[in-house]
Amino acid sequence: MKVFDYIIVGGGSAGCVVANRLVSAGKRVLLLEAGPRDNTPFIHIPATFVRVLGTKRTWMYETEPEPGANGRVLVVPQGRTLGGGSSVNAMIYIRGQAQDYDTWRDLGCDGWGFDDVLPIFRRCEDNGTLAGD
């Protein structure tokens, strides 16, 4: 029987990062993910991401009827593969609005203001061909 120091449930972005950090620190980690590996080309070619929607690599959640959408039920696809939503989002990265982070800070979440998280965003972003913040 294998023994692990940590069991992480969910192989989305956060689960994979936490697992990597723990393994790098010499810990034995079991990472559990409901879906398959992210080895389909449709995850890695931006224009083809729609080919993974409704497959074993996504959960297709539905909202309740939305009054602001004329009573329609909206489909909210979520990742069910290693990498989670980051693997099924057309390879798009968008920072949140600065005001949202500042609101979290103002509500008592110390360290979550935009100026606090901006250095972390910059550390995660690596595109040498573009410039600017």
What are these regions (language model features)?
Residues 1-133:
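N-terminal redox-cofactor-binding region of secreted/periplasmic oxidoreductases
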